[in-house]
Design a protein with these regions (language model features):
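Structured interface patches
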Residues: 1-186
Length: 186
């Protein structure tokens, strides 16, 4: 893990220096993220549990800068990706997802406001310092899908089983003749 991500930095100094941090870490370096992933993987049969899931890489960068013309304020932009093991909520099988985060964050002091910068998400900071490691971890946790499912239904055992069953049996439609029955009764 990059040790430089662990240090406390003054936000204004990061922004005025245009500081860039390269991210080349692993899931195991982010304790809270690892806990969230581990809870999801707990649904798997112990035989299917991936042994090296904590070794999945997180790669990218974040950059601090100043935005605004009259009253400058610190911003953080970036692009980083994590490959994460998860459990499909349809078929309960192991799958790997790619979580890409492209933050555009304005780092404001509590109560501070800004106008005409709608492209930035506002984060109010209670302190003038931050640890890039914590910011990256929080962004990754927020980017995790609430319900993980195979994008390709052809890879999902539950979808395949449903499609196969649907082809094999005629669906019973209990209300198919209801309209004609109602007309007869009138």
């Amino acid at each position: 893990m990059n040790d430089q991500l662990q240090y406390d930095y003054i936000v204004e100094k990061l922004a005025s220096a245009g500081q860039v941090f390269e991210i080349c870490s692993k899931i195991k370096d982010f304790e809270q993220l690892a806990q969230v992933i581990e809870k999801d993987l707990a649904a798997l049969d112990p035989k299917e549990f991936p042994s090296m899931w904590k070794e999945s890489e997180i790669i990218g960068e974040i950059k601090f800068d100043l935005a605004g013309t009259e009253e400058c304020f610190p911003i953080m932009i970036g692009d980083f990706t994590a490959n994460i093991f998860a459990v499909c909520q349809r078929c309960l099988d192991l799958m790997e997802i790619k979580v890409q985060v492209k933050p555009k964050v304005a780092l404001m002091e509590l109560g501070q406001s800004m106008d005409n910068f709608d492209e930035f998400e506002i984060w109010e900071l209670s302190e003038s310092t931050l640890k890039p490691h914590e910011v990256i971890e929080e962004l990754l946790i927020m980017a995790l899908p609430l319900s993980v499912m195979h994008n390709d239904k052809g890879k999902c055992k539950a979808s395949l089983a449903y499609l196969n069953n649907e082809k094999k049996q005629d669906l019973v439609r209990p209300f198919a003749n209801l309209r004609s029955q109602l007309k007869k009764n009138k």
